[in-house]
A protein has these predicted regions:
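Alpha-helical transmembrane signal-anchor/signal-peptide segments
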Residues: 96-120
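Internal/C-terminal transmembrane anchor helices
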Residues: 71-97
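Membrane-embedded alpha-helical segments of integral membrane proteins
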Residues: 15-64
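Cytosolic juxtamembrane helix at the C-terminal end of the final transmembrane segment
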Residues: 59-68, 99-107
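Negatively charged, low-complexity tracts enriched in Asp/Glu with abundant Ser/Thr
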Residues: 4-14, 139-140
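Extracytosolic and intramembrane catalytic regions of membrane-associated proteins
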Residues: 118-218
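Membrane-interface helix-boundary motifs at transmembrane edges
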Residues: 7-12, 63-76
Length: 218
């Protein structure tokens, strides 16, 4: 009897450890996907994680059925967490975790982005790629300021001496739109964004004076 209790305790501990490892690995994936993965890699990593979680979910369901006469709390917890992580990942391409991380990203990197904006406005930072398409490649350090490569897009209105600076949140993939944190002191551009906010407020909103969160489809 004592041996049986010891075995059950060991199994419970192993199950708890597996749950913690699964959650930790998923969190690493979520943050890596948001901050670091190139946009052309994201759909494949997302698909791989979805398939992995689906396989784990099926395994948990099978085990619950087999152990239904002597079901442990940890088994149900494992099933629930796996199902929850699968839902978070599968639903609208990571929409829920990405929305949470986006809010964290905006607050944590606010001062760093503000510093970059000041450098652009004083012409210390300019487009620096060979294609001369408005892209400025920033040094690759942590935390990432502009996702999917740490590039920013700079547009200068020479007539009005104003600038619009885009920091990527997501570069999108397949037919997905791109999303940005955008600074602009150009009144015409502001009007465009205000119109976008009116049309689709669930995807576009004003963060503060001169700052917007905008979703665009190129």
């Amino acid at each position: 009897m004592q041996q049986t209790n010891t075995n059950d305790k060991t199994k419970d501990e192993q199950m708890t450890k597996k749950i913690l490892i699964l959650v930790a690995v998923w969190l690493i994936f979520a943050f890596t996907d948001y901050f670091y993965l190139p946009y052309f890699v994201q759909p494949f990593s997302w698909l791989l994680v979805c398939i992995t979680l689906l396989v784990l979910l099926v395994r948990q369901i099978v085990k619950v059925i087999k152990e239904r006469k002597n079901l442990k709390t940890n088994r149900l917890l494992n099933l629930s967490i796996t199902l929850f992580l699968f839902f978070l990942t599968f639903y609208n391409f990571n929409k829920i975790p990405n929305s949470i991380i986006e809010k964290i990203d905006w607050n944590i990197s606010y001062n760093k982005r503000l510093k970059i904006v000041k450098e652009v406005l004083t012409n210390r930072l300019k487009p620096n790629t060979e294609m001369n398409n408005g892209i400025c490649r920033l040094p690759f350090d942590f935390p990432i300021i502009s996702n999917g490569g740490n590039d920013i897009w700079i547009y200068g209105n020479k007539t009005e001496s104003t600038k619009t600076i885009k920091f990527w949140i997501s570069r999108g993939f397949f037919d997905s739109p791109q999303t940005y944190f955008i600074f602009t002191n150009d009144n015409e551009v502001k009007k465009q964004y205000e119109e976008q906010i009116k049309r689709k407020p669930e995807y576009n909103w004003k963060l503060e004076e001169n700052w917007y969160r905008i979703m665009e489809r190129d």
